[in-house]
């Protein structure tokens, strides 16, 4: 990525028994560095529904997008990672 290119957006996907707030200590400093960040908030109904919600979230941020998934969120980003706007995925 050259200095003329914009930074990727980052979409965080939480694991079971968690919510998007678990990423707050990461989001604040990343936003301070100029990254657009959003924590997807899904209801853990079915994986297909959660993937659909993350794909909709990808549509709300600037491209390209980096998906970050923790635990169950890794399954979700695997499903959502087929979107053409996804530049990479991080599993934690």
Regions found by a protein language model. Name each.
Residues 62, 77-79:
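Generic preference for hydrophobic/aromatic residues in regular secondary structure cores
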Residues 25, 79-80:
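Active-site signature of alpha/beta-hydrolase-fold catalytic machinery across serine-
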Residues 3-5, 80-85:
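Short, conserved loop/helix-junction motifs that constitute active-site signature segments
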Residues 5-62:
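Active-site catalytic motif of lipid deacylating hydrolases and related acyltransferases
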Residues 68-73, 77:
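Gly/Ala-rich beta-loop-alpha elbow adjacent to hydrolase catalytic centers
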Residues 85-92:
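A conserved short beta-strand
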């Amino acid at each position: 990525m050259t200095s003329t290119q914009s930074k990727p957006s980052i979409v965080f996907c939480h694991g079971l028994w968690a919510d998007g707030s678990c990423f707050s200590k990461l989001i604040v400093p990343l936003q301070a560095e100029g990254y657009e960040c959003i924590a997807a908030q899904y209801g853990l109904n079915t994986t297909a529904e959660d993937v659909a919600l993350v794909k909709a979230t990808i549509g709300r941020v600037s491209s390209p997008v980096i998906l970050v998934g923790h635990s169950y969120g890794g399954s979700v980003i695997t499903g959502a990672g087929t979107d053409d706007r996804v530049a990479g995925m991080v599993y934690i």
